[in-house]
Amino acid sequence: MRRRFLLLSAPLSLAGCGSLLPAQKYIPRTSWPLQPQPPNYIPARANGPVLLVRTISPAPGLEQRGLQCLTPSGSLKTDYYNLWAVPPAEALTQGLINWAQASGHFSAVITPGSRLTPDLIIEGELSELLVDLATNQARAQMTVLIIKPALNVTGFAQPVTQAQLTATALVQGNTPGAQAAAQSEAVANLLTQVMVLLDRFSP
């Protein structure tokens, strides 16, 4: 009888062990926007070139949405409680479309699948978006390829230029919100460089 009592009480004892562990603190997740706005809006040129913006691809590790920082020791850390609202490469693609439309350089800015024929194509890869804690700076980096499409079905597309662009912004504070704001500013500075490049090679 005593043995049966011990066996029956064992699950209750094990269940009671859970109450001895400290309760895990709830940490809410926050989504931060990555939507740098163009500095101004200029109406489209009626006779301007047509720009095709291909989707910017993410470098390995940048497919995820967590904010990243580089520690003074050189290790990369990802914050899984502070996230971008959309993956950074997607946000950069949309930002490039918005900035190109607002620049006034182009009669139309299109994406793959459009029936319009482009005069210029841009594609690239987002290779870095983080806060460098050693310098207290946000840093954004991408590789850009600008292409002139083939003039006819028998022709070949011609790369016009390739460039690796880097932009920074000072982090004003030590909160996740300050880090997100600085990275957004760095992306805006990056897009400014891209627009200068596009203006240089626009027909």
PLM region spans:
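N-terminal export leaders
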Residues: R3-L7
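Soluble periplasmic/extracytoplasmic beta-strand elements of cell-envelope proteins
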Residues: V50-T55, Q68, I121-E125, R139-L145, ...
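A structural "domain/chain start" motif
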Residues: G18-P88, F201-P203
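Extracytoplasmic/secreted envelope proteins and their assembly/folding machinery
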Residues: A89, T93-I97, S184-V187, L191, ...
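Surface-exposed short loop/turn segments
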Residues: S19-W32, P38-Y41, N98, S103-T154
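Short secondary-structure boundary motifs at beta->alpha junctions and helix caps
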Residues: S75-N82, N152-Q193
